[in-house]
């Protein structure tokens, strides 16, 4: 029989495990997790530490899903079961553990594209940020908040949080990946307020740094973001090249982000009038979105297919926009409503164009209201 292991020793390992998770060191994190699970069998009783382990296990799963996404039904245990177990002990969480609960729950809701819910949890976590002493941990939180605000176009909130995070990451050489991701967010926000050239400067820097990291995911993401900026500048030919490169890398490594890249490629082919290529990309993208069970992109693919490759049925388009709005994906709806209205205007279907312009104004109003919540 093994001697009881002091909980302090296990706590040290839990902290090391979390550092590996934050750094996306999946293999090392998995090995240490197994070691900790073995230690827990003979650890002296400490309920707080067991709760800490449950929270870190949940965060570990989020990390793995980011690096190697799999369908939730294929995982053991499912996210929902892990959440239920943690929430059943929520009343026991105080201080730092309560911070982790809200922070990780926010990350989960962000993963599910429930952006408003994610922000709500992050706000609760921010109230507990005083319990966080580690500077990198604060930077991680700031980065995550910047990320979700970017997705709902709360530009200045996002820029503020991203800049604070970047200031911290710049002090630490090991956090090159996060520096690149902060550059992505800052550039995306600059694009949203039409400072495209400034955004491109950040993105070219991010692409160079991503190549130095030699990480396929980051390189593909950098190509995608440069493509998005070129698209915003109206340089469709160059954007097409960047999207093709991003899609190829994402697909080669079986990253879920391939769905997004192929959607952007399909969209740009449609706008360029390259309909044969658009059909090929659409078939590729809709298959990928179905395999990943990505309802948002299934809806977006259906929408642009109907708009550019189908008959432009108003009922189908309206149903697609209703679905996007019901998921609070207002920024996505805004961009596609603009294209839909412009498309009908070009086709001289002025009544339909006016209908979608009015809906676009409605979405802009909702986004503006969110900025003051």
From Swiss-Prot:
Record protein name field: Response regulator aspartate phosphatase J
Domain notes: Contains a small N-terminal 3-helix bundle domain and a large C-terminal TPR domain, connected by a linker region.
Binding residues annotated for L-glutamyl-L-arginyl-glycyl-L-methionyl-L-threonine, in chain numbering: 147, 150, 181, 192, 217, 225, 228, 260, 297, 300, 335
Pfam families associated with the record: RapH_N
Record entry for activity regulation: Inhibited in vitro by the competence and sporulation stimulating factor (CSF), encoded by phrC. However, CSF has at least three targets (RapB, RapC, and RapJ) and the physiological importance of RapJ inhibition by CSF is unknown. Interaction with CSF induces a conformational change in RapJ.
GO biological-process terms attached to the record: sporulation resulting in formation of a cellular spore
Organism whose genome encodes this protein: Bacillus subtilis (strain 168)
GO molecular function: phosphoprotein phosphatase activity
PANTHER family in alphabetical order: TETRATRICOPEPTIDE REPEAT PROTEIN 29
Segment forming the signal sequence: none
Keyword match Cytoplasm: yes
Gene Ontology annotations for the cellular component aspect, listed alphabetically: cytoplasm
Subunit structure and binding partners: Monomer in solution. Homodimer.
TPR repeat ranges, renumbered to this chain: 99-135, 146-179, 220-253, 259-292, 334-367
Job of this protein: Involved in the regulation of sporulation. Acts as a phosphatase that specifically dephosphorylates the sporulation initiation phosphotransferase Spo0F and inhibits its activity.
Record key words, sorted: Allosteric enzyme, Cytoplasm, Hydrolase, Protein phosphatase, Repeat, Sporulation, TPR repeat
Main location: cytoplasm
SUPFAM superfamilies referenced in this protein's UniProt entry, alphabetically: TPR-like (SSF48452)
Cellular compartments annotated: Cytoplasm
Annotated family: Belongs to the Rap family.
Known EC number: 3.1.3.-
PROSITE patterns for the chain: TPR, TPR_REGION
InterPro entries for this protein: Bac_ResReg_Asp_Phosphatase, TPR-like_helical_dom_sf, TPR_rpt
Gene name, Swiss-Prot/TrEMBL: rapJ
């Amino acid at each position: 029989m093994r001697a009881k292991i002091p909980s302090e020793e296990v706590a040290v390992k839990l902290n090391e495990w979390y550092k590996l998770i934050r750094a996306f060191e999946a293999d090392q994190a998995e090995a240490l997790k197994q070691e900790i699970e073995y230690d827990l069998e003979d650890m002296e009783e400490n309920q707080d530490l067991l709760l800490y382990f449950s929270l870190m296990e949940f965060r570990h799963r989020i990390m793995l899903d980011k690096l190697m996404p799999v369908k939730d039904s294929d995982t053991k245990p499912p996210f929902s079961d892990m959440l239920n177990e943690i929430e059943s002990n929520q009343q026991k969480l105080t201080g730092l553990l309560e911070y982790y609960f809200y922070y990780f729950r926010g990350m989960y809701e962000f993963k599910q594209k429930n952006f408003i819910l994610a922000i709500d949890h992050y706000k609760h976590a921010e109230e507990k940020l005083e319990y966080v002493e580690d500077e990198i941990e604060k930077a991680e939180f700031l980065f995550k908040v910047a990320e979700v605000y970017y997705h709902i176009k709360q530009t200045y909130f996002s820029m503020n949080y991203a800049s604070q995070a970047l200031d911290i990451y710049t002090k630490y050489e090991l956090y090159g990946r996060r520096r690149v991701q902060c550059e992505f967010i800052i550039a995306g926000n600059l694009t949203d307020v039409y400072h495209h050239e400034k955004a491109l400067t950040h993105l070219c820097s991010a692409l160079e740094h991503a190549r130095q990291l030699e990480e396929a995911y980051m390189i593909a993401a950098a190509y995608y973001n440069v493509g998005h900026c070129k698209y915003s500048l109206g340089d469709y030919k160059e954007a097409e090249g960047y999207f093709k490169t991003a899609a190829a890398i994402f697909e080669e490594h079986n990253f879920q982000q391939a769905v997004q890249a192929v959607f952007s490629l399909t969209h740009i082919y449609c706008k360029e009038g390259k309909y044969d290529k658009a059909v090929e990309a659409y078939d590729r993208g809709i298959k990928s979105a179905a395999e990943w069970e990505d309802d948002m992109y299934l809806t977006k693919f259906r929408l642009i297919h109907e708009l550019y490759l189908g008959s432009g049925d108003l009922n189908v388009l309206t149903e697609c926009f209703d679905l996007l709005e019901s998921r609070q994906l207002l920024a996505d709806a805004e961009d596609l409503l603009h294209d839909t209205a412009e498309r009908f205007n070009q086709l001289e279907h002025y009544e339909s164009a006016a209908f979608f312009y009015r809906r676009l104004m409605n979405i802009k109003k909702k986004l503006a209201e969110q900025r003051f919540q």
